[in-house]
Amino acid sequence: EAATSGIDIFRIFDALNDVSQMRPAIEAVLETNTTVAEVAMAYSGNLMDPNEDLYTLDYYLRLAEQIVDAGAHVLAIKDMAGLMRPAAAAKLVSALRERFDLPVHVHTHDTAGGQLATYLAAANAGADVVDVASAPLAGTTSQPSMSALVAAFANTERDTGISLQAVSDMEPYWEAVRQVYAPFESGIPGPTGRVYKHEIPGGQLSNLRTQANALGLGDRFELIEDYYAAVNEILGRPTKVTPSSKVVGDLALHLVGAGVDPKDFAENPRKYDIPESVIGFLQGELGTPPGGWPLLRDAALADRSPVDHTVEVPAELEGDLASDDHDVRRVALDKLLFPKQYAEFQEHRRTYGVTDQLSDRTFFYGLVEGEETMIWYGEIDEQRPPLSVRLDAIGEPDEKGMRQVILTVNGQVRPMLVRDEHAESTVAEAEKADASNPGHVAAPFAGVVNITAKVGDEVKAGDQVATIEAMKMEAGISATQDGTIERLAFSQPTKVEGGDLVVVISEK
């Protein structure tokens, strides 16, 4: 379907470098006879370190041999955290070019600030392609600067043939775009060598900071980085690419939020709640990590039933997947590959309309008084024109944090009440758990809590009494002692802050 839609090059990778899991995708690309299978090795560790015993040159060469045997057209090195030093790039690329007659494509992130040197070393060793970003969007968690690379190779044997002036002329546009997306910045003001310790992928580093802020942990980010490094070791140093990087990040955030030392968790994981993504990883949901299973696996999975990770195509989608209608096939693929996200997307459209027609600035920041925009409801239809909406005035918040907003919709004045999430409310705050009371079960961090226990239930310490979901992370909340559920802090799924009371357990 993607090839039919115009995709020419498919970068295929597995989060744990398992070629057997990449083969179906490689074979599907080969069957098109028109597209390119670029198969990537996720890079981790430091192959120049004499103490490196997992991600060695021999490891990557054996992996590359499996990739070539599977039918790859292009070999890619996917250095998601920017860990590959120049000497390592030269050594690895040289070895790949000596053994395999395939183009080599190098991808990295510039978190530490030295990856232009890595690209120069890779190119001189025979790399054919590298990934860059326009200068205003380059550096730190992004890729090295395109302008810098073009200038570095100008008038040399590896001259790119790209006009530096043409590249520079595009930069003001991307500077303006970056300002619109400023709230999603990583928060890293410049390069950081800490990446060589924590190994957080560039694509995850900004998301992790956003997650930390949402969980109320934003001021403890350096501790989160330290815990990420510790969790990486605990889980056996897996290659960290989506979704394996999420597993490490989820556990690091969870331990920081719950105030649990990584060493204590590693010694007795059954004492603590474990995020669902971590349980799935330990159950083999993502495959087998390159270094084998970590020591805590058996203890963490004790009393949990084995899970069959085979996914069957729902019968109701089989016909749609074989449909001649392009749109029907696409919807079926969305439902099959991303069922939760598809449902959320449809709910968003039912609630807010077709928001992808709004300008980025309007979508992220809203209208200013006197500003007008067009809004679509339902699918875009030439027979049903959009609504013209102008923001006229915004009132002061009331005691519940509600503001009256005056709009003009298609020429008619429409007042409405809107909750201001940033306004202070005089409504009583949620009850806090008493840390000195072992019967008080608290939310470990900010999120939406759903209490699964009922008043009167007999529970043992460690039994799950609720679940919490926040920023794509799900985890259980367990009883803190043996006893009876005496009181629930709320009856419906509720947004809470870290430390809010969830349930009260009376001791037997």
What annotation goes with each model-predicted range?
Residues P189-G193, E199, G203-E424:
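Terminal or standalone catalytic/regulatory effector modules within metabolic enzymes
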Residues A3-T4, V19-R23, E27, D58-E65, ...:
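Amphipathic, non-transmembrane alpha-helical secondary structure
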Residues E1-P103, L120-A127:
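Alpha/beta enzyme core
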Residues K432-K508:
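Structured functional modules or segments
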Residues V413-P444:
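Catalytic P-loop NTP-binding/switch module of NTPases
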Residues D14-N17, M41-N46, D79-A81, H109-T111, ...:
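Short, ordered loop/turn segments at secondary-structure junctions
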Residues M80-V260, N268:
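Catalytic alpha/beta core domains of metabolic enzymes, predominantly
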